[in-house]
Amino acid sequence: MPAFLGLKCLGKLCSSEKSKVTSSERTSARGSNRKRLIVEDRRVSGTSFTAHRRATITHLLYLCPKDYCPRGRVCNSVDPFVAHPQDPHHPSEKPVIHCHKCGEPCKGEVLRVQTKHFHIKCFTCKVCGCDLAQGGFFIKNGEYLCTLDYQRMYGTRCHGCGEFVEGEVVTALGKTYHPNCFACTICKRPFPPGDRVTFNGRDCLCQLCAQPMSSSPKETTFSSNCAGCGRDIKNGQALLALDKQWHLGCFKCKSCGKVLTGEYISKDGAPYCEKDYQGLFGVKCEACHQFITGKVLEAGDKHYHPSCARCSRCNQMFTEGEEMYLQGSTVWHPDCKQSTKTEEKLRPTRTSSESIYSRPGSSIPGSPGHTIYAKVDNEILDYKDLAAIPKVKAIYDIERPDLITYEPFYTSGYDDKQERQSLGESPRTLSPTPSAEGYQDVRDRMIHRSTSQGSINSPVYSRHSYTPTTSRSPQHFHRPGNEPSSGRNSPLPYRPDSRPLTPTYAQAPKHFHVPDQGINIYRKPPIYKQHAALAAQSKSSEDIIKFSKFPAAQAPDPSETPKIETDHWPGPPSFAVVGPDMKRRSSGREEDDEELLRRRQLQEEQLMKLNSGLGQLILKEEMEKESRERSSLLASRYDSPINSASHIPSSKTASLPGYGRNGLHRPVSTDFAQYNSYGDVSGGVRDYQTLPDGHMPAMRMDRGVSMPNMLEPKIFPYEMLMVTNRGRNKILREVDRTRLERHLAPEVFREIFGMSIQEFDRLPLWRRNDMKKKAKLF
């Protein structure tokens, strides 16, 4: 039986899908059929290569050992020509092929690139190391690169689509295109090879699209006629402006007729000089009132130069895109507004744009001693003019003088305490029997205080309820003294220990009568007559009250020297005990004064560097703190011992109970929340501390705080209330700019904020403002 050879003896089969047969040869011998194929893939050098594989594939259908004897193992040939059968009489010789990369002999399949041979595993990319036998590759500087690395390092992108260019390319004006990407700008059709391309400086046009451009109407604008006078421009220079030609003397301002030789401003195709343009169409700066040229900063309906838009608090310019607050004609930084708000909360009094002024008027009996004027928006109006203001405006926007009580606000300062002590206030009993001279002095001082509300530093009081119940009742007051009393007597209440209660500043009598001195400008209080019997009974009651305030119910002799003349009571201490302490205090006080002076100068130097309201606020607090410490050092053992302080002159006079101008305490309502000028919810009554003399200061309401608006806010759609930055959003006059959310319907409010209005009011201020900013209602 004939023996057949295995494939291992004849060679390996290898082929490529993209291979093509370049030559074939058939050899027939006694029933045998042999095919020899040379598989080779050739491409133009310089383009993308596919690995050149060349192998001799021998397909042996049937071999007869008598006709053909194998001479050895058939291997892949690297010769570009077909290897013919070896001569059986000569031994076969194979050339040794070495790999170009590793230098080892090549066995089995070999890749040939041009004249170099590689193992399949050795033919890889120089950069990423990927296999190049299965895909295309590029040769650059003797190195073999894959497509991605070559394009990334040395590739050229198409100017039209941005992709890498391979194969055929089109180069025009130094730019490279794909053939399909180099197209007409107007009709988008690719340019045919050899076609003429028109480039007008921006676009590439084909012949069809470039023909209308040559005969466009623009060429008529550059005619030889002057656009000003209409005559031909012959010899001489022509001025080209506004796409027209002009004589040099015909290019004039449309408004003033001045010949324009330098800069000009065009409006609707007509030239203007800068002066006339600003006068006709210019925009003025709200700060410097000069016309704005160039960049303009717009805030609401107001316009500013970038250098003129400064914060009214810190005087710093606003940068582009910075947030600002607009209040009236002033602009604020958000941080400066917060510091101003804090400073106003710390002030004991607050001034407002709406205040009451007092001017000297007539002093005729029965007429007011001062004429009341109201200041509204920097304009002083007489009360007759105020009557012509609409009712709503009069109630909510200005103060009504007939509802204002001119009650001074007493602080706990050291000067006020000395003044009260000098007026004869008793530390233990407020109202000892006064003398006529002392009472007149007290009365003059109190009237001076109550009538000095129009001064610059005087406190200004707020609006309050315009239906007080106490202001319409007859006013009665019991005034002890040597003068005959007028009006109905009002006995003072007694404590359980039979001691009389004396009114303090916070507990003034509800009914009293003061003789008319022109204080009340609207009505004259009635005068009540007193019968002789009632007068005698009243005199007896007054004596009981008067003498009950002295030891043994006996008034001391005015000529008698007080027994106690020292700060220490009930008896003077020994000098041996208090002497060293007094010396140490006197010596230490001088050192403390020097130290305080040095610290104060250092603080002023540091704080003056902070050119802001916050720095001034800190300086003011430090100075007030030092003054309080200094007053505490000067204070005696007891706040105000009667007839014991040697440096305070003794006096037998006593002051009247504290009262305001018309004698009524301001009615304060605590049943409602109040809103300050920033829209914050605050308590109805300010918390007051007890004064050093044990009395409560007169309660008052802050300036600018009134009863809540009883009118229901109008409801507007959310789109009308929304604040945007793209365009000018004019908010209606009926809308409160600081409380835009109040004009939303309850269901819309809940849909936007996810809560009710009452729940929203209970949130802190920063949280409410943040939610309003997100909803574009801030």
Curated annotation (Swiss-Prot):
Entry's localization field: Cytoplasm; Cytoplasm, Cytoskeleton
GO biological process: animal organ morphogenesis; axon guidance; cilium assembly; cytoskeleton organization; lamellipodium assembly; positive regulation of transcription by RNA polymerase II; transcription by RNA polymerase II; visual perception
Pfam families: AbLIM_anchor, LIM, VHP
Summary of subunit composition and partner proteins: Binds F-actin. Interacts with ABRA.
Keyword Ubl conjugation: yes
Residue positions where Phosphoserine is found in the record: 216, 367, 422, 426, 431, 435, 452, 455, 458, 498, 587, 640, 655, 677, 706
Protein name (database record): Actin-binding LIM protein 1
Tissue-level expression: Detected in liver, heart, skeletal muscle, brain and retina, where it is concentrated in the inner segment and in the outer plexiform layers.
Location in chain, cross-link Glycyl lysine isopeptide (Lys-Gly) (interchain with G-Cter in SUMO2): K620
Functional description taken from the UniProt entry: May act as scaffold protein. May play a role in the development of the retina. Has been suggested to play a role in axon guidance.
Residue segments, region Disordered: 339-370, 414-510, 552-597
Major localization class: cytoplasm
Residue ranges occupied by any LIM zinc-binding domain in the UniProt entry: 97-156, 156-216, 224-283, 283-343
Modified-residue entries (Phosphotyrosine), positions: Y373, Y396, Y439
Classification via InterPro entries: AbLIM_anchor, Actin-binding_LIM, Villin_headpiece, Villin_headpiece_dom_sf, Znf_LIM
Residues bearing the modification Phosphothreonine: T433
